[in-house]
């Protein structure tokens, strides 16, 4: 059993390496840069706000968005499962011994790497653009990195579950819109105090809110 698991992990690593080569060594890489650009763009929309009269709205929003980026990783997993189910790739992996496990392990590795690059680029851009982040120490950034890892791990099962449930294009589009609405609205861009009380309670019950809150607490 251990030998078969090791074989599945090795196959998953080969799959992840092939996918990452496509992601980083082809024009696809320029599309991947859109993620950090959008994060910085949405954060910059909040530049005229002050949070508690001490923190700029841009720094608050960017760190909150980065803390919730695990949800985008979950969306990536969902979209990969949807696309590869439709083109038959996922079905073919099921015919191989431990094919599903190796496929999932490879996807987790590749999505984690792409999400990590998005985080690094977004944080680097924010460090130079938003002065409030420049006062953070190395220890603060290490704590931030740890909170982001926990956020990513918390959201991945959601992506796998949605990928298993979504079977139609309409279902995929509805799930995508819901994910992006939650990503931008669950206390990531601005404090939930601007919402009505019932919506504040609903937002505070979501893991994305606590992911953003943990990231902001770190820095």
Regions found by a protein language model. Give the residues of each.
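Aromatic- and glycine-rich beta-strand/loop motifs that create alpha-glucan
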Residues: 1-36, 88
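Short alpha-helical transmembrane interface motifs in multi-pass membrane proteins
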Residues: 2, 28, 59, 70-75, ...
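Short hydrophobic, aromatic-rich alpha-helical segments embedded in or entering the lipid bilayer
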Residues: 3, 7-14, 190-219
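Residue-level recognition of transmembrane alpha-helices
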Residues: 15, 33-34, 65, 84, ...
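Hydrophobic alpha-helical transmembrane segments of multi-pass membrane transport/permease proteins
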Residues: 22-49, 58-76, 116-118, 175-184
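Transmembrane helix boundary and interhelical loop/hinge segments in multi-pass membrane proteins
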Residues: 23, 74-98
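Transmembrane helix segments
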Residues: 43-49, 163-209
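Alpha-helical transmembrane segments and their short interhelical loops
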Residues: 100, 104-183
């Amino acid at each position: 059993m251990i030998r078969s698991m090791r074989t599945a992990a090795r196959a998953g690593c080969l799959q992840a390496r092939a996918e990452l080569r496509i992601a980083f060594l082809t024009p696809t890489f320029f599309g991947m840069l859109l993620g950090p650009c959008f994060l910085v763009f949405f954060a910059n929309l909040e530049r005229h706000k002050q949070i508690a009269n001490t923190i700029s709205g841009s720094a608050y929003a960017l760190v909150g968005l980065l803390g919730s980026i695990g949800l985008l990783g979950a969306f990536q997993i969902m979209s990969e499962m949807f696309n590869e189910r439709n083109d038959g790739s996922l079905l073919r992996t099921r015919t191989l011994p431990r094919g599903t496990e190796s496929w999932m392990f490879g996807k987790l590795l590749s999505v984690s790497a792409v999400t990590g690059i998005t985080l690094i680029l977004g944080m680097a851009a924010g460090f130079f653009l938003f002065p409030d982040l420049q006062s953070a120490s190395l220890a603060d950034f290490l704590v931030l990195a740890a909170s982001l890892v926990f956020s990513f791990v918390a959201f991945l099962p959601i992506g796998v579950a949605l990928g298993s449930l979504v079977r139609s294009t309409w279902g995929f589009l509805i799930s995508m819109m819901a994910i992006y609405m939650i990503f931008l609205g669950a206390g990531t861009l601005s404090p939930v105090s601007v919402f009505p009380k019932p919506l504040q309670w609903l937002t505070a019950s979501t893991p994305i809110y606590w992911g953003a809150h943990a990231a902001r607490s770190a820095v």
